[in-house]
Regions:
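Substrate-recognition/cap regions that form aromatic- and gly/pro-loop-enriched pockets
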Residues: 1-59, 63-66
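Intrinsic disorder at enzyme termini
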Residues: 74-98
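C-terminal, helix-dominated tail/subdomain
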Residues: 18-22, 70, 74, 80
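Short amphipathic alpha-helical patches
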Residues: 63-70, 98
Length: 98
């Protein structure tokens, strides 16, 4: 079901969407991260898939810019309510392009 939020996995799309989750507890996780990165990038190229913000997120701010049509509005809202970036961290700055 589509929603009208700015950066959710379903925002701005009218098609059905599906979630596929992978998890491992095996250490080290290098091979898992390699597979997850391959899948994330392949799904992006093939289907414009959006990765869950709280999972392994290998995509770049360039991917985010292409996937989320309201990302500029989201950045504007963040800058207006958090002008000093107090609630940002390196993930947010890197992935959202602050």
């Amino acid at each position: 079901m589509p929603d009208d939020t700015l950066i959710s996995m379903a925002s701005g799309v009218s098609e059905d969407w599906y979630a596929i989750s992978f998890i491992t507890y095996v250490e080290p996780r290098d091979e898992f991260y390699a597979l997850a990165t391959f899948l994330a990038n392949s799904m992006f190229e093939l289907f414009q898939a959006r990765i869950h913000w709280g999972k392994w997120f290998p995509q770049t701010s360039d991917h985010v810019n292409q996937l989320y049509p309201k990302i500029d509005t989201f950045r504007d809202v963040c800058s207006r309510y958090d002008p000093n970036g107090v609630f940002r961290n390196s993930f947010v700055e890197d992935k959202l392009g602050f």
